[in-house]
Amino acid sequence: MNRFTAYAALFFIFSLCSTAKEAGFQHPAFNFRGTSTMSALSGDYSAAPTPLYKSWALPSSLNLTTQPPPLLTDRSYYELVQALISKMRLDCQTVGDMTWRHLSEMLFASWNSVKEVSLKAASVTLWAIISIWFGLYWTLARLITLFLWTFSIEALCLILLGCITSLIYKGALSLSEHLPVFLFMSPLKIIWRAAFSKRNYKNEKAVEGYKGFSVPQKPPKSAVIELQHENGSHLGYANCIRLYSGENALVTAEHCLEGAFATSLKTGNRIPMSTFFPIFKSARNDISILVGPPNWEGLLSVKGAHFITADKIGKGPASFYTLEKGEWMCHSATIDGAHHQFVSVLCNTGPGYSGTGFWSSKNLLGVLKGFPLEEECNYNVMSVIPSIPGITSPNYVFESTAVKGRVFSDETVKELEREASEAVKKLARFKSLTGKNWANDYDSDEDYGLEKEAATNAPAEKTAQTNSAEKTAPSTSAEKTAPTNKPFKWASGTARQNKRQLRHPRRRYKRTTNGQNGRTDHHSYGGENQSLGDRGEDSEQGVSESPAEAQTKQTRKTWREEQAKQFTSYFDAIYKWGAQEEGCPPGFRKCGNIPGYYHPRTKGETKWGQKLCQVHPELADKTAGFGWPKAGFEAELQSLNLQAARWLQRAESATIPGAEARKRVIEKTVEAYRNCITNAPLCSLKSKLDWAGFQQDIREAVQSLELDAGVGIPYIAYGLPTHRGWVEDHKLLPVLTQLTFDRLQKMSEASFEDMSAEELVQEGLCDPIRLFVKGEPHKQSKLDEGRYRLIMSVSLVDQLVARVLFQNQNKREISLWRSVPSKPGFGLSTDTQTAEFLECLQKVSGAPSVEELCANHKEHTRPTDCSGFDWSVAYWMLEDDMEVRNRLTFNNTQLTERLRAAWLKCIGNSVLCLSDGTLLAQTVPGVQKSGSYNTSSSNSRIRVMAAYHCGADWAMAMGDDALEAPNSDLEEYKTLGFKVEVGRELEFCSHIFRNPTLAVPVNTNKMLYKLIHGYNPECGNPEVIQNYLAAVFSVLQELRHDRELVAKLHQWLVPSATTKEH
């Protein structure tokens, strides 16, 4: 019921609304024409207009009456709402019109104001400019008028001279139109270049002090060819290499290309280098890689050789080839290091050697550039081949073959690769005047009879191989590349026609790159995506690392650092520090102790030696007066007391030269050693220690270690007594590397200037130095006195630190001993070496001949020897030696000087460790440590500098032995703290020079005693017998000039029974 009532109500309401709406829309006021719509919409229903009726349509008798306007309440809700909405819209329109009218008036007024102000400002500005300009002219006119009025005659003369000069210029200009301009410009250019230009490099140099060899030998694969001028005269050399793109190419110095002809010694053919297209060319690096016209390899009869790019070049021996009288000669060279973007090479070159390649076995390393002029460096430089993916390097990663470490740092390699990438892209963008380049030509079907392959039939991609690539030739047409005056004919034949040519390397490079900084497309060669020059911190090859590789590297680094910390804690735990002043040697104090890890035993005479002396009394007479010293901490302490007392006694009477004298000697020493200028370590080229550069330095340092030498304190505690145990263990070597790096890091950061000797050890800047008696025969007088020769052995880590900081200089001195005063690199084992040394001495001393030098040596030189030299070296001498080292470092940095200063502080203020574990700290700085890496080099230089302090014009030294100028004042040595003895004969390095080819050893009897009492061949051990026989023949070689003695010794020391039974 309720539901029915609700439905009825709704139906009633709906009907009501519908009726009202229908009634409203059909009202006469809305349906007839003429109804005011605006009135209806506005709701003005009180005055609705009357509909218009035609008069003829109305009945005549009908009376019309006016209807009253309907009330609002009579309207429907729909009409009321529509009227209200219309009212609101009209009101809004009215308000908007009023607002727009007022806004327009305001904007118009503002525009007029701004326009008026702008016009006034422009007018004022223009009048200001006019006033200033007019003022300048007016002022200038007044000044000119004043000048002419005051200096009338002078002004008239200037005007006349100006007119004359103008006439002369016009006459010269008219004359130059009928004469070649170069007649005037060429002399001016020559004068300008001679006066103002400066070349940074000269193209040939013979390295002073370097002695190489030359043997007849052909280049590998005949890959070296001669470059000639157009008239046939020699110009330089070029080298044929095999690119990774498959083509053969020529590599030469960029300065050798102009007007050059590639010439074959075998075939006699000549090809102008202008027909070769450069795929890489760098004037800054002075190297060009060029590919030639078709069949150029056959015309020149060459084959492509393998090569090594800049990122893989390491130090070591090398060779280069030149033509001499129509025959190829092989010359020796040594890859020494880096010089800017070049590689420094020790070799002797001459005019016309430019462009020749340096070879390691059958691999090309680079081409000869010349040598630097601005630094007066004593070496040549080599231009290297940059790594260009797809051209000079593969698109995937190799393991480096440079076993001795790379020459260049990562930054230099990145720079070389970046320049190479830019150069290749520049060539790729190059367009000739015709709009079409030779390298853009596809293989010519008319020339070779080949059919172009459709893109759908392209061969499957092949993976590039390391040492074997498909042999190809540049894709070009003979008609486009042959010059007008052809010096040769193109080769043709079925072999040429049947071989499909690959595209030019430049086009190949464009095809394999996406134009994104040289990044290669992984679809090109089957390799990885590789960014040119994108290398990680520790990367050997300069490739981007995957996240997995980066994670692995970080894991290894974390493990290495943690292991180094553990080992450091392990070694620190063995020290027991505690100072004690009583009962210590002079200049030392006891600062602690460690467990006794060393237990040396005193040697005695062997039964073999006693037997030989009994059988051969003459041998007994020769070996009499020698014996073995005692060993152990008591002998060490006894000898240390004697030598330290003498050291301090001499130091008290010595005086330090003044600042000017030291500066003069340092500058003279630097000039004498200028041929040994070397680079700083790679690890210290930046403001902070660089791990990547350190890896290269430590690799070279480890490989130069003496593996059978002792590890020293505290590393003996680990139970591995020699270097070999640490170096050859693949788990311990990374830890050793990290320990060395951590020490260098501490040296670069610590404030060590005021530290004591034991504090340096406690802070981890250095290790104690092991002290022991050297196991060599001593004279009986020294044995009776107890003054034994002490050796101060530096620890393994300190050895590596010294090698990292100084190995470049020390090795250069050894290589160039002929041109520097220090002679650690020379020997006297052969007559040739003896003659060579005497020739060097003759040149330095100014003697007319070697014979005259040997006969009257006192007039030309003075042989001197310092007794107890190591103990006589004062700390200021070590400082001056370090100053010379820093000045001889080409690219020295503040970090390098800081590290070397820390090393000097540690070596001059050391903690000595006796065999029983007693630790003795130096209280007086100084003393050269005999087991240090720098001992031989620094002692020789300090000895030379001491001679300079005594007024010698020249000097040469080998440790404490020296030959110096006769004008040296020997009395001055006492003021320096040295005890110097003058030899009566021409003696140097324990040899007496009798004639130009004869050097007799001084310590013959000592050598014989050590030989017969240092070995026991009767034990039957093959290794002992082998070492004994090697020592015997070494002694016989030293005594080779005394034939009678050699025959006797051979009979005594090498009996037939020994050789037969064993």
UniProtKB/Swiss-Prot annotation:
EC number: 3.4.21.-, 2.7.7.48
Signal peptide bounds: 1-20
GO molecular function, one term: serine-type endopeptidase activity
Domain Peptidase S39, residue spans: 207-399
SUPFAM superfamilies: DNA/RNA polymerases, Trypsin-like serine proteases
PTM info: Specific enzymatic cleavages in vivo yield mature proteins. The protease probably cleaves itself and releases the RdRp (Potential). Cleavages have been shown in the P1 protein, but since the N-terminus containing the serine protease is shared between P1 and P1-P2, cleavages should also occur within the P1-P2 protein.
Biased composition (Basic residues): 497-511
Active-site residues (renumbered): 255 (for protease activity), 286 (for protease activity), 354 (for protease activity)
Site, Cleavage: residue positions: 204-205, 399-400
Catalytic reaction list: RNA(n) + a ribonucleoside 5'-triphosphate = RNA(n+1) + diphosphate
Gene Ontology biological process terms in this record: DNA-templated transcription; proteolysis; viral RNA genome replication; viral translational frameshifting
Cellular component, GO annotation: membrane
Ranges of residues in domain RdRp catalytic: 859-974
Polar residues bias locations: 463-484, 541-553
Parts of the chain that traverse the membrane: 121-141, 144-164, 172-192
InterPro entries membership: DNA/RNA_pol_sf, Luteovirus_Orf2, Peptidase_S1_PA, Peptidase_S39B_luteovirus, RNA-dir_pol_luteovirus, RNA-dir_pol_PSvirus
Function text: Precursor from which the RNA-dependent RNA polymerase (RdRp) is probably released. RNA-dependent RNA polymerase plays an essential role in virus replication (Potential).
Protein name in the entry: Protein P1-P2
